[in-house]
Amino acid sequence: LDISQVTPGHTLVVPKEHYRNLLEMDAASASQLFAQVPKIAQKVMAATKAEGMNIIANCEEVAGQTVFHTHVHLVPRYSADDDLKIDFIAHEPDFDKLAQVAETIKNA
């Protein structure tokens, strides 16, 4: 369990091998980590009777990472008024710009 308990049952899935965050993990190690995530998440959901769950991996300080060892947060959700706030601000799409960004990512 995460000692901060953003919501009751807030759990961390942590690999034994050290990686700063998911961005440093090789595919095999990431696959091993994420093979466990649904199994543990299902148990947390069953045990807590939560209505939903956020599954979060913060990568680097600007994204909220404060512990620099890879870990995945499983945050049970009970209502929209709990202590976890994640806001995605929708923007009017510029499809030309989206195509440019997609092409840049594809070629990276």
Describe the role of every protein-language-model region.
Residues L1-A108:
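HIT superfamily nucleotide-processing domains
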